[in-house]
Curated annotation (Swiss-Prot):
The gene is yueG. This is Spore germination protein-like protein YueG. Belongs to the GerPA/GerPF family. It comes from the Bacteria.
Length: 73
């Protein structure tokens, strides 16, 4: 009996790529990382023009521990 797969969604195409096929209940991460960057930092493309004037990024992680990934098989 043929199966009908729902939409295919590709979240990223890197070494830690993620993709889902059809109906997905939960996607569990296998690794975690934090990054703090100011406005206009992750702009990609040709002829990008960024006008930020004065910009400040406050990256403070106040909690002691984040969600663990030890149970994500």
């Amino acid at each position: 009996m043929p199966a009908i797969v729902g939409p295919i969604y590709i979240m990223s195409v890197t070494d830690n790529a993620a993709a889902s096929f059809g109906d997905v209940f939960a996607i569990s991460p296998k690794s975690v990382a934090h990054s703090g960057a100011g406005s206009g930092t992750f702009q990609l493309g040709d002829f990008v023009k960024i006008n930020n004037q004065t910009s400040k990024t406050l990256f403070k992680d106040a909690d002691i521990t984040d969600e663990t990934v030890s149970f994500n098989g």
